[in-house]
A protein has these predicted regions:
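Charged, cofactor-coupling segments
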Residues: 1-98
Length: 98
């Protein structure tokens, strides 16, 4: 099954933001008793619009993990050095490795 995840925030007549991703519902356990989401859309989330100070550490880790997955999936498909540099810049971790 494929679902759309579209969290958003809007202030009437001022601004709005929405992040949209397609997700595949997959088994999280061998017996299928728990489900999880696997991203199908591999596009970086624009980091310069994020207030990192408002995020919990686990939320920043999720974003860093998502960006690592985007980088790993998309980088082999790119041919130009300019595109590769853009992807590296836009998927770099927010958290320093511990």
């Amino acid at each position: 099954m494929i679902v759309s995840n579209e969290p958003g925030y809007y202030v009437v007549n001022e601004f709005g933001i929405r992040i949209e991703n397609l997700l595949e519902v997959v088994n999280a356990t061998a017996d299928g008793s728990y489900l999880a989401f696997k991203p199908l859309t591999h596009i970086p989330i624009q980091k310069n619009l994020i207030e990192v100070d408002l995020m919990e550490r686990n939320e920043v880790k999720w974003l860093d993990d998502y960006h690592a997955e985007v980088r790993n999936k998309v980088m082999p498909l790119l041919t130009s050095e300019e595109s590769k540099a853009w992807l590296l810049e836009n998927t770099s971790p927010l958290l320093a490795k511990e």
